[in-house]
């Protein structure tokens, strides 16, 4: 991959994030959303255990992981899954 191709990919990613409304989120929040998108099932549900092991968020410290998870819940991106186990969540906003 050459330098120009890499720069074009970065520009395309920025444009896609802008189009989806996530470009203004801090980096860790965006990374966790990528992790959520990677682990959700057909009903848009996921467990925090699945997410914690995901490549996008596995580098987060324990405290950062829980802080960002709580922030995404409070901002309405994800929520606790109704009628499911305590560590089950659901993606609320659609992409």
Give names to the regions the model predicted.
Residues 42-56:
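Short acidic, hydrophobic short linear motifs in intrinsically disordered regions
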């Amino acid at each position: 991959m050459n330098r120009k191709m890499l720069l074009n990919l970065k520009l395309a990613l920025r444009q896609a994030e802008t189009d989806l409304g996530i470009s203004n989120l801090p980096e860790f929040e965006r990374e966790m959303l990528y992790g959520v998108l990677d682990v959700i099932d057909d009903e848009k549900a996921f467990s925090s255990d699945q997410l914690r092991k995901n490549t996008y968020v596995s580098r987060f410290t324990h405290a950062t992981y829980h802080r960002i998870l709580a922030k995404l819940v409070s901002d309405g991106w994800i929520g606790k899954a109704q009628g499911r186990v305590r560590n089950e969540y659901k993606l609320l906003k659609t992409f």
